[in-house]
Structure formats: C-alpha cells, structure tokens
C-alpha cells in the first residue's frame, strides 16, 4: 500500500488500544480461574484472538461482547483435550505461555503457527519444561513449531536460571510451576515485564519476588476477577515518535499503561531531549495520559538492564535516532534477532532504503543522525512493528513515495492503526 508522506503537523487526542501483553494474560488467568471473569478494554488484535481461540478449543466458554469479554473459567483441572491442533497464528506469546499452561495437563496437544512463527525457536521454553517432566517434540534441535507436547499431572518443581531476559519464557515457567508439586525458583537474567506476576496476585494467588528471583508454589487456585486493560505503551510509542519528529506536532495519548517494567521508552526519550508530559496518573491501574510535542533530539546510548523494558520499542527508537543530532548506539539487544523477524537487520534495511545511516551489529545498531528520509519500497516480512515504524517514517518523506508491502501485518497488534493515523494528520 502507498503510505501517507510529507506531513505538515500532527494534532489531536488518541485513546490507545489495550495492552497486548495484559490482554493475553487476562484471557489465560480468566480461563484458569474459577468463576466468571470480565475483561474490559481488551485488545482485539490477531495475536490476542489466537489466545482466545486456543482456550475455547481447550473447553473454555468465552463470550466476546461489545464492551467486554466474558470468560467462564474452568481452573487448571477443567481444561479439556482439544479436538484439533491449536493454531497460534503469528503469536510467540500464545505458543510459549500456553506451553506452560499445558505442562500440567495429561493429554497430547499439537500447536502450530504461520510461516513466521514456524521459524522462531522454542527451545528456551521446551528445555526447562522437559526438566519438569513434559514430553515435547519440535522441529530441529531448536524446537521450531509445530510442537507436539504431552504434559504431566506429576510435574516436578524446578530451580532455573533464565539464559536470556525473556518475559515469555519466565511466564511459561510460572504457569508450569503453578501446577508442580512443590516450590519452584526462577531466576531472571535481567528484570522483564511483570504482568504475569501482577496478575497472579490480582486473581488471588501468591508468589515471592526478591530482586531477580521468583519463588512460586504449585497447587494454587485462582478466583475470577474483573480486569481493566490499560492502553499499550508499545503501541503508544509510535505516536510518541511521530509527535517528536514531525514538526509542528502536539499529540495527547489517553490511558497509556505505565507499568514500571515497560517505561524504558520514556527514559530514552528524556535522554534524547524529547518533550513528553504525564498527567491524569492512575497508580492503581498503572496508566496515565501522555502529551508529546515536536522536539530537537540528540543521540544517546541504549543498553544494559533497560533493554528488556523497551525491547519491543527498539524499531521505533531506531527511527527516532535517525532524526536525532549525533550518533545513537543500541547494544545488548540480541533478543531482537528472534522476534517476528530479525529486527536488527530488517529495521536497518528498511530505514537505510529510505536514506538512513544505520550499521547493524551483533547485538544492536549504530545510527548516525540526522538524516533526511526519501521514498522507497519496504516489506514488513509479516512483522507488525516494522509496518508501523515505516508508516511513521513515511510522514517525514518529502521526495518520492513510500510503498509498504504486507501492511496487513499491523493487524497483529493494532487493527485501527491507519484510521488513528488519519485522525491526527493535518495538511
């Protein structure tokens, strides 16, 4: 599709769609709790719909109403053997976390996904789950999907140090540990998003978190809750970037989740000299209104323990860096290589095609700014964040057209992205 170019200013107010991570987990905990859970503000993107369908296939009654989703939870012991293989679509969150849920079920399940998901290694999850007593068969030594697994009602507890900083792997092991006989200890490499831990407490469970060490006992039961999902800061990041780099812009973003494990993007913007204000802060919901204005940005260095707190925002941060004065260095971000695409290479290729000066490295990028961007043809390769990054980059293009191939990938996390873009574009 041809993208909008040469924007003369952005203005307006947007309500950000529900947080994808919280939407996934609220469906899972609602299904595993006893009673009726209602979820308000859920994201109805393709990834979340994959999770919803998987739990329907596992015997959970889920009603999608206009204002909320209603889940008739069955508990861990109420899941049923599905009549067919579970289709995870493009969702790494779905296949990894549901692997943990299924670890304590004594039936055999096959899980598969699209071409992109079928290239993503699952061994980070399958290796510790096998240690707990789960039988899993995948393709190659990296356990690429499809996965066939048979859980065990006699799961062994585990003490496990995560080899990488990954909230998905951590969460999969937490779901398995909840079904094990005894106490499990999970030790993180770096602190990652803590939505799973928060939701355990919200649904009446318990765990102990001491720094990077998580202790969790098996045999817990959950009680149904009402869940209000805040807006996704990973989706808001694209509008934050647009407001910063398109001249004469001022945007207000409502109901943005500001969980402390997800706000690395705000710290980077501050370090680059960007103007973002927080207001209407709701500490209970961990949400706020963000107001962003056009700013003169400067290069910075991004690495270390902040990386897990902004891993999904690095593509749009790379675009910000192309419009900052000076050099930006991103490091310790090798996790980008095993996302929906190799995001280090694909981000560099896409923005360089538009005139940026980005050098990919083994664990990140070196970006020289400031550069003028021009028209080009860019392929998302099925990666939603590459698509949205390119659409924001196109707003700066004054010469040539920007054509985006496989733009439908954006529906994974933000089905209303282009209508929201239209709403804030002037001139």
From Swiss-Prot:
GO annotation terms (biological process): amino acid biosynthetic process; aromatic amino acid family biosynthetic process; chorismate biosynthetic process
Assigned EC number: 2.5.1.19
Residues annotated for phosphoenolpyruvate binding in this entry: 20, 92, 120, 168, 343, 385
Segment forming the signal sequence: none
Principal location: cytoplasm
GO annotations of cellular component type: cytoplasm
Location relative to the cell: Cytoplasm
Reactions listed under catalytic activity: 3-phosphoshikimate + phosphoenolpyruvate = 5-O-(1-carboxyvinyl)-3-phosphoshikimate + phosphate
Metabolic or biological pathway, per its Swiss-Prot or TrEMBL entry: Metabolic intermediate biosynthesis; chorismate biosynthesis; chorismate from D-erythrose 4-phosphate and phosphoenolpyruvate: step 6/7
Pfam family, any one: EPSP_synthase
Active site: 312 (proton acceptor)
Annotated 3-phosphoshikimate binding sites: 20-21, 25, 166, 168, 312, 339
Entry keywords, A to Z: Amino-acid biosynthesis, Aromatic amino acid biosynthesis, Cytoplasm, Transferase
Gene Ontology MF term list: 3-phosphoshikimate 1-carboxyvinyltransferase activity
Subunit-level organization: Monomer.
Family note: Belongs to the EPSP synthase family.
Function: Catalyzes the transfer of the enolpyruvyl moiety of phosphoenolpyruvate (PEP) to the 5-hydroxyl of shikimate-3-phosphate (S3P) to produce enolpyruvyl shikimate-3-phosphate and inorganic phosphate.
Protein name: 3-phosphoshikimate 1-carboxyvinyltransferase
């Amino acid at each position: 599709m041809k993208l909008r170019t040469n924007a003369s200013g952005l203005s307006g107010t947007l309500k950000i769609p529900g947080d994808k991570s919280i939407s996934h987990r609220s469906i899972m905990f609602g299904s595993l709790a006893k009673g009726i859970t209602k979820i308000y503000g859920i994201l109805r993107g393709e990834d979340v719909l994959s999770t919803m369908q998987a739990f329907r296939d596992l015997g959970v009654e889920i009603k999608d109403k206009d204002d909320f989703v209603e889940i008739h939870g069955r508990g861990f012991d109420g899941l049923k053997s599905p009549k067919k293989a579970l289709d995870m679509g493009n969702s790494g969150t779905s296949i990894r976390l549901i692997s943990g849920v299924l670890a304590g079920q004594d039936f055999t399940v096959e899980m598969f996904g699209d071409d992109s998901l079928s290239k993503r290694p699952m061994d980070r999850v399958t290796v510790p789950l096998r240690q707990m007593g789960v039988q899993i068969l995948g393709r190659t030594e990296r356990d690429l999907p499809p996965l066939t697994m048979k859980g065990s009602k006699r799961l062994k507890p585990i003490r496990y140090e995560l080899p990488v900083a990954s909230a998905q792997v951590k969460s999969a092991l937490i779901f398995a540990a909840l079904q094990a006989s005894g106490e499990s200890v999970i030790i993180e490499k770096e602190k990652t998003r803590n939505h799973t831990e928060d939701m355990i407490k919200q649904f009446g469970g318990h765990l102990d978190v001491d720094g990077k060490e998580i202790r969790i006992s098996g045999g817990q039961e959950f009680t149904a809750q009402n869940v209000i999902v805040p807006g996704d800061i990973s989706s808001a990041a694209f509008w934050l970037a647009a407001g910063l780099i398109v001249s004469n812009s001022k945007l207000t973003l409502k109901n943005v989740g500001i969980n402390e494990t997800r706000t690395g993007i705000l710290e980077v913007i501050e370090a680059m000299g960007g103007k973002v204000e927080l207001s209407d802060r709701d500490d209970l919901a961990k949400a706020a209104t963000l107001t962003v204005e056009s700013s003169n940005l400067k290069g910075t260095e991004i690495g270390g323990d902040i990386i897990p707190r902004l891993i999904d925002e690095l593509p749009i941060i790379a675009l910000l860096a192309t419009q900052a004065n000076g050099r930006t260095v991103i490091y310790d971000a090798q996790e980008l290589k095993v996302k929906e695409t190799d995001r280090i290479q694909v981000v560099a290729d896409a923005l360089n095609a538009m005139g940026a000066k980005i050098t990919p490295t083994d664990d990140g990028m070196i970006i020289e700014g400031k550069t003028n961007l021009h028209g080009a043809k860019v392929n998302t390769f099925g990666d939603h964040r590459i698509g949205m990054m390119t659409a924001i980059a196109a707003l700066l293009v004054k010469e040539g057209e920007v054509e985006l191939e496989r733009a439908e990938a954006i529906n994974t996390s933000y089905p209303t992205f282009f209508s929201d873009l239209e709403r804030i574009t002037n001139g």
